[in-house]
Amino acid sequence: MPSLPVPQWIVSPGLTDYAAALADMESRAAAIHADEAGERIWLLEHPPLYTAGTSADPAELLDPRFPVYDAGRGGRYTYHGPGQRVGYVQLDLTRRGRDVRAYVHALEGWVIDALALLGVKARRAEGRIGIWTDDVRGREAKIGAIGVRVKRWVTLHGFSLNVAPDLTHFTGIVPCGIAEYPVTSLAALGKATGFSEVDAALARTLPAFLDKLRPSD
């Protein structure tokens, strides 16, 4: 089968309004489904906010100090804000295997591979979605979140990676419903890494991520 076109790669400067990003994702998903637009990888940064997934428990919103949005994705509460790289991945799974679990597994692997290029040994954790590593005290800590939605086999949302956010902002929620593990970042691990380096690592590991998604016959 011929190879698929490489998804459009967009990096938005500054802070992107969350509601506007949601509307843009929905519009693009409809266009991809209608074969009126190609797939897209959209890298951006949001102002401080909390998002609630479809499994969010209101008791886990401890201090709504920032705006709270219903995201429509799977999962529970998470935080987005300055210093965090957000990746919205919009792929057509009718062309890439129609396997949501394989997609989520590959998405986790993409972020893990990118972190390896940045000198961070990250991993999956059994029963806990997301990207995990050891913090400077040797504790298992979350450095990245995964939250996806699939609509008519087109993916929406994606991942967030903590580059240098204010980690105290996570204390307003129980991140992803997991209270017993801390949150960390590249900066907290002593990695003086900016968005340009993170984006370059993601770009280098993108082909391997796409290769894991088997094109449908």
UniProtKB/Swiss-Prot annotation:
Annotated compartments: Cytoplasm
Molecular function, one GO term: lipoyl(octanoyl) transferase activity
InterPro entries: aa-tRNA-synth_II/BPL/LPL, BPL_LPL_catalytic, Octanoyltransferase, Octanoyltransferase_CS
Record pathway: Protein modification; protein lipoylation via endogenous pathway; protein N(6)-(lipoyl)lysine from octanoyl-[acyl-carrier-protein]: step 1/2
Entry GO terms, CC: cytoplasm
Enzyme kind, highest EC tier: transferase
Reaction equation(s) it catalyzes: octanoyl-[ACP] + L-lysyl-[protein] = N(6)-octanoyl-L-lysyl-[protein] + holo-[ACP] + H(+)
HAMAP family the UniProt entry points to: LipB
NCBIfam families tied to this protein: lipB (TIGR00214), PRK14341.1 (NF010921), PRK14345.1 (NF010925)
Other comments on record: In the reaction, the free carboxyl group of octanoic acid is attached via an amide linkage to the epsilon-amino group of a specific lysine residue of lipoyl domains of lipoate-dependent enzymes.
Family the UniProt entry places it in: Belongs to the LipB family.
Protein function: Catalyzes the transfer of endogenously produced octanoic acid from octanoyl-acyl-carrier-protein onto the lipoyl domains of lipoate-dependent enzymes. Lipoyl-ACP can also act as a substrate although octanoyl-ACP is likely to be the physiological substrate.
Protein name: Octanoyltransferase
Source organism phylogeny: Bacteria, Pseudomonadati, Pseudomonadota, Alphaproteobacteria, Sphingomonadales
Gene that this sequence comes from: lipB
